[in-house]
Amino acid sequence: MGFSTFLKLQALLARLAWGASRTCPDPSVIEHQKCSPSGTRTVIYQHHHRKLATCVAVHGVTINGGQDPRLIHFARTMAHFGVTCVVPTLGGLASCRWETSDLDELANIVTFTADTIQQPVGLVGFSFGGSYALIVAGRSEALKHIPWVITFGAYHNLADVLEGYALNLKREPQNKTEWDEAIYQRLVCLYGQRDAITFPQEGWQELEALLRRYCSEASFEEKRRFYNHYLHDLDTEVFKPLPEPEVLNKLSPEIGRASCRERV
């Protein structure tokens, strides 16, 4: 790594660490919305003249989808340094559900983007989105377009993750951090099963509002109030997501990439 590249990397990391609230709007970054050929909402962030590379940034389990404030800040920062960021909202993850259709759509977006710009497209994935990125990078239709993959917090096996969720439901949280995680897991599982669960209408509205702000704006006191009012007396069985084994396998990088003959 040359010295100038090292300095650019330092500047990029510093800008990411500042957060959106401490970063001034950048007039050189252009944002425009598009729909993929199959109709998935996508926002593209790019520098008005500096275009060094292109990547697709994949969100995790968040009902904000590609509009998660942290992901927007990441995309704007990357664009500031010349990396065009394509940010889709994947329907399954944005609904707190585990759906293999997200993999198909992500692969389609990568292929469509690469064909459009006639250049390779990298993948950057966060949390569950990181695991999806790894799986898609091993697919034959997308593999040739993806020169690199970067993930943050990806899992290896979805069944193990959900088993951990189930075990956590049986434990009494011992500190603020554990409470924060326990409440979040319950909200995600409940929201993902909203079509099949009887729950007060005002509770659904409060739950959605809380989930949208959970990781960046909602206070711990607000989270505990919601838990005490709506979640405390619910049977823990309600919170257990139950994807079919076939779905678990397809959404697990450990298994989903097992047949890939190329190095990822």
Predicted ranges, named:
Residues F3-A53:
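N-terminal cap/lid segment of alpha/beta-hydrolase-fold proteins
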Residues H48-F81, V87-L90:
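Short, surface-exposed "cap/lid" segments of acyl-processing enzymes
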Residues A53-T54, G122, W148:
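Structural motif
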Residues Q67-F74, P88-G122, A137-S140:
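Catalytic nucleophile-loop/oxyanion-hole region of alpha/beta-hydrolase
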Residues G125-A133, V149:
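Gly/Ala-rich beta-loop-alpha elbow adjacent to hydrolase catalytic centers
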Residues I135-T236:
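Alpha/beta-hydrolase-fold enzymes
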Residues A159-Y165, E237, P241-E244, L248, ...:
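Active-site-proximal cap/loop segments of hydrolase catalytic domains
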Residues G256-V264:
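Residue-level detector of conserved catalytic or cofactor/ligand-binding positions
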